[in-house]
């Protein structure tokens, strides 16, 4: 045995003579020891050999009573495909109930509807819906660990995977649209003081803005065009707050059909501090406050106005509100009837919060709030329909402004600020001022298709009598 080892060492690794004897003996010993190990394999090697072909020894003794075997990569892929096929069934439910595709936009009611669907689809038991009494934005911000704590045992991973899948699909859609649309060029030095108090510095001649990506109804009404619209110097920019920002750069990220609140990236930098009276209290909502109605129920000419620069309300509420671009497949009237908690007697026929959830517009917007007041009999002393179609009158504009400020948590709201929000709707063809009549306005968008009521039907419900006052 030693001779065999010595010969091999002489051939492979000749060394200095002073160390030759020691190395030869060590090599021979290693060879002998290796031969013994080859004859008597260790217990660990036996276990390793068993684990490779069967995989059974990887299961601990504590899991001997498990009903299901461990998932292999192959079985996981099959399971994932099966879950995706099951999840696709929720899309029909979304269309039926008017639930936005983007979970970030869900109301508490829509979160509950999703869980009810999952309960029926997966035959779940002991599901505590009260634990999920939250909006979609709060739900998506929970994180997986916190979500699993609230979810029923053994199915939390499935529900979380479904939620992640819907969010991912929405993000991918936004990214695809983003690649097809360039950013709006940054425009410095927009805002400057003037006699009106909140005008802007005249925009440069030929300033261009890129159109937003269109989705749903927009694709049919407004064919995509690579030519950008051009803003001339004569256009009205009298809608920015004075001294709100000295220098503003506006950067628009692409807006998909649905996207989480906050993803509209309006970045502004100020070189000076705003004054106290120039706080974020404005009469209207943010730039997207009218777009959900425009992009689903308005005319082509009005839809083209979406390409314009944002109004002064764009900087309100930290620019966190999102566009509602999806068109529900049913009217608001049908939506209310399908709800498990119909509108109570004595309450507004058109609650603003429910209407906001129906249109997927996010926070309550001014036009939605006005419809709530107009559909509430208890508010007819200060705002009411005139009886002439969708025309309405502010009998007490200060009270309307006060209530709007209370709803938006803006105690300094007044009619002057409210009227600025109303004027923003003029060129969007949502609300127009009735000429020759003080405090009289008219909805000029297609409210009938949106609400499912004709003006006469709504007037009859509310007991409205035609206004004979000139």
Curated annotation (Swiss-Prot):
Keywords on record: DNA-binding, Nucleus, Phosphoprotein, Proto-oncogene, Transcription, Transcription regulation
Stored InterPro entries: Ets1_N_flank, Ets_dom, ETS_fam, Pointed_dom, SAM/pointed_sf, Transform_prot_C-ets, Transform_prot_C-ets-2, WH-like_DNA-bd_sf
Annotated stretches, region: Disordered: 270-291
Compartment(s) of residence: Nucleus
Annotated positions of the Phosphoserine modification: 225, 296, 299, 302
Coiled-coil residues: none
GO cellular-component term (any): nucleus
Highest taxon, organism lineage: Eukaryota
DNA-binding stretch(es), residue numbering of this chain: 364-444
Pfam short name (any one): Ets
GO annotation terms (biological process): cell differentiation; regulation of transcription by RNA polymerase II
UniProt domain PNT: residue ranges: 85-170
The keyword Transmembrane helix appears for this protein: no
PTM per Swiss-Prot/TrEMBL: Phosphorylation by CDK10 at Ser-225 may create a phosphodegron that targets ETS2 for proteasomal degradation.
UniProt cross-references to PROSITE patterns, sorted A to Z: ETS_DOMAIN_1, ETS_DOMAIN_2, ETS_DOMAIN_3, PNT
Molecular function in Gene Ontology: DNA-binding transcription factor activity, RNA polymerase II-specific; sequence-specific DNA binding
Similarity section: Belongs to the ETS family.
Function: Transcription factor activating transcription. Binds specifically the GGA DNA motif in gene promoters and stimulates transcription of those genes.
Annotated protein name in UniProt: Protein C-ets-2
């Amino acid at each position: 045995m030693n001779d065999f080892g010595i010969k091999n060492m002489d051939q492979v690794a000749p060394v200095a003579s002073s160390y030759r004897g020691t190395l030869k003996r060590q090599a021979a010993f290693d060879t002998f020891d290796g031969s013994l190990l080859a004859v008597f394999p260790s217990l660990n090697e036996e276990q390793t050999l068993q684990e490779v072909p069967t995989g059974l020894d990887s299961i601990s003794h504590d899991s001997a009573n498990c009903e299901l075997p461990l998932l292999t990569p192959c079985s996981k892929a099959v399971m994932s495909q099966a879950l995706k096929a099951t999840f696709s069934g929720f899309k029909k439910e979304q269309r039926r109930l008017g639930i936005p595709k983007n979970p970030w936009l869900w109301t508490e009611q829509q979160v509950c509807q999703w869980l009810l669907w999952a309960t029926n689809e997966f035959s779940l038991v002991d599901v505590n819906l009260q634990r999920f009494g939250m909006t979609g934005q709060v739900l998506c911000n929970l994180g997986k660990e916190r979500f699993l704590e609230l979810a029923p045992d053994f199915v939390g991973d499935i529900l979380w995977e479904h939620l992640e899948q819907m969010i991912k699909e929405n993000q991918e859609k936004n990214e695809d649209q983003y690649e097809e649309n360039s950013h709006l060029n940054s425009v410095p030095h927009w805002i400057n003081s003037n006699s009106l108090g909140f005008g802007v510095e005249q925009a440069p001649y030929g300033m261009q803005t890129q159109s937003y990506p269109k989705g749903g109804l927009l694709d049919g009404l407004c064919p995509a065009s690579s030519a950008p619209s051009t803003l001339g110097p004569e256009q009205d920019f009298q809608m920015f707050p004075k001294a709100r920002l000295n220098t503003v750069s506006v950067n628009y990220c692409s807006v998909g059909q649905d996207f989480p609140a906050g993803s509209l990236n309006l970045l502004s930098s100020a070189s000076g501090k705003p004054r106290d009276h120039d706080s974020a209290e404005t009469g209207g909502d943010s730039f997207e406050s009218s777009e959900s109605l425009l992009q689903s129920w308005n005319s082509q000419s009005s839809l083209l106005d979406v390409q314009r620069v944002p109004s002064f309300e764009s900087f309100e509420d930290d620019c966190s509100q999102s566009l509602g671009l999806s068109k529900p497949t049913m009217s608001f009237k049908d939506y209310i009837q399908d709800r498990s908690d119909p509108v109570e007697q004595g309450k507004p026929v058109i609650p603003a919060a429910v209407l906001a959830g129906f249109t997927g517009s996010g926070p309550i917007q001014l036009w939605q709030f006005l419809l709530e007041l107009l559909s509430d009999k208890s508010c007819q002393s200060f705002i009411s329909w005139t009886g002439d179609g969708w025309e309405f009158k502010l009998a007490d504009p200060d009270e309307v402004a006060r209530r709007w400020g209370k709803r938006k948590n803006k105690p300094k709201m007044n009619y002057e600020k409210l009227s600025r929000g109303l004027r923003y709707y003029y060129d969007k063809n949502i609300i127009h001022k009735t000429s020759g009549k003080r405090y009289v306005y008219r909805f000029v968008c297609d409210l009938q298709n949106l609400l499912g009521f004709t003006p006469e039907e709504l007037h009859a419900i509310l007991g409205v009598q035609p206004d004979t006052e000139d």
